[in-house]
């Protein structure tokens, strides 16, 4: 039998109990977006721009402004978050720093006006009205069901974590100074009007957040007003600032962000150490020692640089045609921290694997494929000195929505299973998505076939048809 993946490394063979999910009421306004699939959702989100056009001409390249005059869409956007939502959430308990920030841009610098401890709506509204401060609410998808629904679909579409923030800014005020982010940004204008100015990046596709001074950013490449129902996209590194015009009502906009630490460089950092570890087992040259006293040198000698360059070329040659990379940290981090599947009602029926256990003659099919990753890695059993490779299945079905993207220091649990490497072909059969009979799985014995199906079924990863 495979073993459950536990964060402590204690991997016991015990079945899981399907979790129950408590949901709040859906917004009264019916969604005007298409949630049939991740692809159809993204297509409807950026409509009327075609998806092919977006990725060919705008993604990671330049901003896209979609201005709409659509009262139905504007009403739907308004339902995503409002001051009344903030008031309701304050009654339940929100805290400065973790849930909400109060800030204002003064002379090109961000001034934080947070108090300590729990945030009360009357105090927030006082700072909003009297100090002209912006209220920033972190990760509202933890509480607003429709945002959970939206961001879960986007995480499936991009295969990357998707966070969000709501910015509520009074008239004649600006919350943040000019800056750029390390994420791809989608702005949805929910209420009021916001004056945006975008500038050419000083660091294209930036890998970190930074504030830029006014004398460095030059003149805007884009200068426009965003109104309810409008959508704005810009790549990471795009310098931007926004203010609510004087004489108008307050502005509320939603920032949806993704692709943080999701570059080719991040992929190489994640993959290369495990790959070198694997190849060193086969290549004695990689296991030979470095020159004496090399670590004491102030500069790297030319012959050492040539040696390392040669090793890198060898690794590149070995990488060609290799199907399995000993890389799991990015996959594991994504699944561990992403949103669970969105469910209508309380979700208990969908999460229940059902009463029928999978037997040899049963046909099974994978479900929640976008919420599961399969990776090969060393056995984490502390008693396995040989460090044999095993197959890990990680999933997000039991992730806690209220913990999504809030950066708590506590180590959250990751859910999944562990199988012998001999099971990888059978798992790939299931992963193709087509229904398959249990007895047709590529395993040596009927017992192994049933045990594999039963383990996946116990985690609600497969359906018995």
Curated annotation (Swiss-Prot):
Function: Oxygenase that can act as both a histone lysine demethylase and a ribosomal histidine hydroxylase. Is involved in the demethylation of trimethylated 'Lys-9' on histone H3 (H3K9me3), leading to an increase in ribosomal RNA expression. Also catalyzes the hydroxylation of 60S ribosomal protein L27a on 'His-39'. May play an important role in cell growth and survival. May be involved in ribosome biogenesis, most likely during the assembly process of pre-ribosomal particles.
Keywords linked to the UniProt accession: Dioxygenase, Iron, Metal-binding, Nucleus, Oxidoreductase, Phosphoprotein, Ribosome biogenesis, Transcription, Transcription regulation
Chief subcellular location: nucleus
Annotated ranges, domain JmjC: 139-271
Tissue specificity comment: Predominantly expressed in testis. Expressed at high levels in spleen, thymus, and colon, but barely detectable in brain, skeletal muscle, and seminal vesicle (at protein level).
InterPro entries: JmjC_dom, NO66-like, ROXA-like_wH
Lineage: Eukaryota, Metazoa, Chordata, Craniata, Vertebrata
Pfam families the record matches: JmjC_2, ROXA-like_wH
Catalytic activity line of the entry: L-histidyl-[ribosomal protein uL15] + 2-oxoglutarate + O2 = (3S)-3-hydroxy-L-histidyl-[ribosomal protein uL15] + succinate + CO2; L-histidyl-[protein] + 2-oxoglutarate + O2 = (3S)-3-hydroxy-L-histidyl-[protein] + succinate + CO2
Protein's cellular compartments: Nucleus; Nucleus, Nucleolus
Gene Ontology molecular function: identical protein binding; metal ion binding; peptidyl-histidine dioxygenase activity; transcription corepressor activity
Binding site for Fe cation: 179, 181, 240
Cofactor: how and how many bound: Binds 1 Fe(2+) ion per subunit.
Protein name: Ribosomal oxygenase 2
Similarity-based family: Belongs to the ROX family. MINA53 subfamily.
A GO-annotated cellular component: nucleoplasm
Modified residues (Phosphoserine): 309
Enzyme Commission number, as recorded: 1.14.11.79
């Amino acid at each position: 039998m495979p073993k459950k993946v536990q964060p402590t490394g204690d991997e016991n063979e015990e079945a899981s109990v399907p979790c129950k999910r408590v949901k709040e009421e859906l917004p009264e306004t019916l969604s005007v977006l298409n949630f049939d699939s991740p692809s159809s959702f993204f297509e409807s989100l950026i409509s009327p721009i075609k998806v092919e056009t977006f990725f060919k001409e705008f993604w990671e390249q330049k901003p896209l402004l979609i201005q709409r005059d659509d009262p139905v869409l504007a009403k739907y956007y308004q339902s995503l978050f409002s001051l009344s939502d903030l008031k309701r959430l304050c009654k339940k308990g929100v805290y400065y720093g973790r849930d909400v920030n109060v800030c204002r841009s003064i002379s090109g610098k961000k001034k934080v006006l947070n108090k300590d401890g729990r945030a009360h709506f009357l105090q927030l509204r006082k700072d909003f009205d009297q100090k002209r401060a912006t209220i920033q609410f972190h990760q509202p998808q933890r509480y607003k069901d429709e945002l959970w629904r939206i961001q879960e679909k986007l995480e499936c579409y991009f295969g990357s974590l998707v966070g969000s923030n709501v910015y509520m800014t009074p008239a004649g005020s600006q919350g943040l100074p000019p800056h750029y982010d390390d994420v791809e940004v989608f702005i949805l204008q929910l209420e009021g009007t916001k004056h945006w100015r975008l500038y050419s990046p000083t660091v294209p596709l930036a890998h970190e957040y930074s504030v830029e001074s006014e004398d460095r950013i030059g003149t805007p490449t884009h200068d426009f007003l965003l109104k309810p129902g409008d959508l704005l996209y810009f790549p990471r590194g795009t310098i931007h600032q926004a203010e609510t015009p004087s004489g108008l009502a307050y502005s509320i906009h939603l920032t949806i962000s993704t692709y943080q630490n999701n570059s080719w460089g991040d992929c190489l950092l994640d993959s290369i150490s495990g790959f070198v570890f694997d190849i060193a087992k086969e290549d004695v040259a990689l296991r030979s020692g470095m020159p004496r006293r090399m670590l004491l040198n102030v500069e790297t000698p030319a012959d050492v640089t040539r040696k390392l360059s040669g090793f890198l070329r060898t690794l590149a040659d070995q990488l060609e045609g290799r199907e399995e990379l000993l890389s799991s940290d990015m996959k594991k981090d994504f699944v561990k921290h992403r949103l669970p599947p969105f469910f209508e009602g309380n979700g208990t029926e969908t999460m229940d694997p059902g009463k029928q256990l999978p037997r040899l003659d049963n046909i099974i099919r994978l479900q929640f494929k976008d919420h599961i990753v399969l990776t090969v890695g060393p056995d984490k059993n502390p008693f396995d000195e040989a460090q044999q490779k095993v197959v890990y299945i990680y999933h997000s079905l039991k992730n806690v929505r209220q913990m999504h993207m809030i950066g708590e220091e506590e180590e959250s649990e990751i859910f999944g299973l562990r199988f012998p490497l001999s099971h990888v072909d059978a798992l790939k059969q299931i992963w193709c998505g087509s229904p398959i009979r249990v007895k047709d799985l590529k395993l040596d014995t009927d017992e192994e076939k049933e045990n594999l199906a039963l383990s996946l079924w116990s985690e609600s990863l497969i359906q018995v048809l």
